[in-house]
Every structure is written in C-alpha cells, then in structure tokens.
Design a protein with these regions (language model features):
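Short, Lys/Arg-rich, polar N-terminal cytosolic tail immediately upstream
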Residues: 1-13
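Short hydrophobic/small-residue motifs within alpha-helical transmembrane segments
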Residues: 60-62
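Cytoplasmic helix-loop-helix junction between adjacent transmembrane helices
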Residues: 109-135
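Transmembrane alpha-helix boundary/hinge residues in polytopic small-molecule transporters
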Residues: 34-38, 69, 107, 119-124
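Helix-loop boundary and gating motifs at the non-cytosolic
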Residues: 12-58
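Conserved MFS/SLC helix-loop-helix module at the cytosolic interface between two early adjacent transmembrane helices
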Residues: 65-104
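Short hydrophobic/alpha-helical segments at membrane-entry points of transmembrane helices
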Residues: 20-21, 104-110
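Helix-to-coil boundary motifs at intracellular loop junctions of multi-pass secondary transporters
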Residues: 45-46, 76, 127-132
Length: 135
C-alpha cells in the first residue's frame, strides 16, 4: 500500500516491505506507550496508589539505561533476528502486562517491552540502512 509512494530508486525489497515495517513499528510503539494514558485505571485495577504505579513505570523507564549494552548485543545479531527477538519480546511483555494479576508482573511486562523494543528498533533501522542508499 505505501510502496506506491516510493519511486524506482528504492529496491524492490524495500518497496515490498515498507507497509509491513510501518505497521509493525506503529504496533510496537503502541505497545510501548500504552501505559501513561491509563495510569489511573491500571492503579485502580491493582488497588494501589498512583505513586506505586509510578514506581513500576520508573523501573521500566530506568531500564533504558541498559540501551548501550543492548545495542552492543543487537549489533552482533542479524537484522532479521534482532527484529524477531524484539517482536517476540514486545508481544510477551504486552501479554504479561495485560494478564498480570499483580503489580510485580505488570512491572516485569512493561520492562520487557521497554528493553526489547530496542532490539526491534535497532534491527529495523539497520535493515533499512542496509537497503536504502545514503545520499
């Protein structure tokens, strides 16, 4: 669908995958950003205070400090493998967050999403840079 806006300077592989990559990136971003608008509802569901849910989200956000180490590991993987690990991890984290019976598993789920989103984003960016010439 999006490939019709790309001219002939793009490789057929890029044109074939641009819609899938765009939809996947949109979905992973939605999984990553689903919590902030619903903090009060999530806190009420767990019967905890807003400050307690804030601690859970702080832990998730602090996991971003692992990004340099995650990036080094992702660089050793193939682009597709990094994207696959990221997608499986984000899906697992979202599922765990959705069905978690307590705040501890919820925190683990959103932290998984936060850490493994780096795998997908770096793998996808690397794949795009491999197939789109720099001008």
């Amino acid at each position: 669908m999006l490939d019709r806006w790309l001219d002939d300077s793009f490789s057929p592989l890029v044109k074939k995958n641009v819609t899938l990559l765009t939809a996947t990136r949109l979905t992973t971003n939605a999984c990553y950003r689903f919590t902030p608008p619903f903090i009060a509802i999530i806190a009420k569901g767990f019967d905890i205070s807003l400050s307690e849910i804030g601690v859970a989200l702080t832990i998730s956000e602090l996991s971003g400090l692992l990004s340099p180490f995650v990036g080094r590991f992702v660089d050793q993987l193939s682009r597709r493998r990094a994207m696959l690990i990221g997608l499986v991890g984000i899906s697992s984290g979202a599922l765990l967050s959705a069905v978690s019976p307590n705040i501890f598993l919820f925190t683990l789920g959103v932290t998984l999403i936060s850490v493994l989103k780096n795998f997908f984003d770096l793998g996808m960016s690397g794949w795009i840079s491999d197939h789109v010439p720099y001008e």
